[in-house]
Amino acid sequence: MTCSVQPCEPDEQEDAGNRAVCPVLAIRQPIDHHSTVSEAPTDPRITVVVPTYNERENLPKLVGMLADLHLPNLGVLVVDDGSPDGTGDVAEQLGRDAAIPVSVLHRTTKDGLGRAYVAGIVRALDDGADIIVQMDADLSHPAEAIPRMVAELRNTDAAVVLGSRYVAGGAVAEDWPWHRKALSKWANVYVNTILRLKVRDATAGFKAWRSSTLRTIDVASVGSNGYAFQVEMNYRVIRHGLRIAEVPIRFEERVDGTSKMSLAVQLESAAVPWRLLRSNIGK
């Protein structure tokens, strides 16, 4: 409630000789809760989308790390592709027991990383997320980088923020296999040469997105799968005249389980940049 001053009526005033004091009436009026003049900024709703396939050992650790961030309005959406090791059941249990909200999107078809991410991102958008974070379940992405990525997104004009291995301050784990390091470096040179993305880590899978960016690039129509999905998402951002920012992270080797990198994924990753170059995205 607020107060306003009610002025004296003429008949309440006395002549100057009596020097009477005009009474001041404090009239209580309701606050306009829709006013934006003095409203404090609200914390954005953040959804971390985590695709899973046979990650029952890693998922509880990841959710615990995310809870330890104590970020307001942060929740997790697990997108499980029918993991035979029971990851989906573990995710459901986390939804009941975890310190932060955990929801699960169960898919019956294992049709690739890109399809899982699209399904999860579309669900998160439908649920009202303001910021959507892409994150692997294998603990290779450092959860502690998320506050910095979100801050970069909120305090600059960046459309998306990458957790980058290859900007100053970024690194990869010493125990990451040499052939994976070489393949990653080559893929970045290859993609940037063809598509001119002008980002250091074009194949990064750790990203914080504005919901408005994801709608602008029409994420539901992204056709690439596997790791090429990351490249197409970046390309759509650039083609729409938006800016990609990068913050340094240390990329770790997975803790448990096996890598999903296959020959088919590598072949798609080699072909997709040429397909994108011939597309009419952003035109």
Predicted regions and their residues:
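Hydrophobic helical membrane-anchoring modules
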Residues: 3, 8, 18-43, 189, ...
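Cell-envelope/extracellular polymer assembly enzymes that use nucleotide-activated donors
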Residues: 45-47, 75, 232
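Acidic helix N-cap motif at the loop->helix transition within catalytic regions
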Residues: 57-61, 85-94
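Short, acidic, metal-binding catalytic loop of nucleotide-sugar glycosyltransferases
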Residues: 64-73
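Short beta-strand/loop segment that forms part of the nucleotide-sugar
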Residues: 73-83, 105
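A conserved acidic beta->alpha catalytic loop
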Residues: 80-89, 139
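Acceptor/aglycone-binding surface of glycosyltransferases and processive sugar-polymer synthases
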Residues: 107-126, 143-227, 254-268
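Short beta-strand-to-loop acidic/aromatic patch adjacent to the donor-nucleotide binding site
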Residues: 129-140
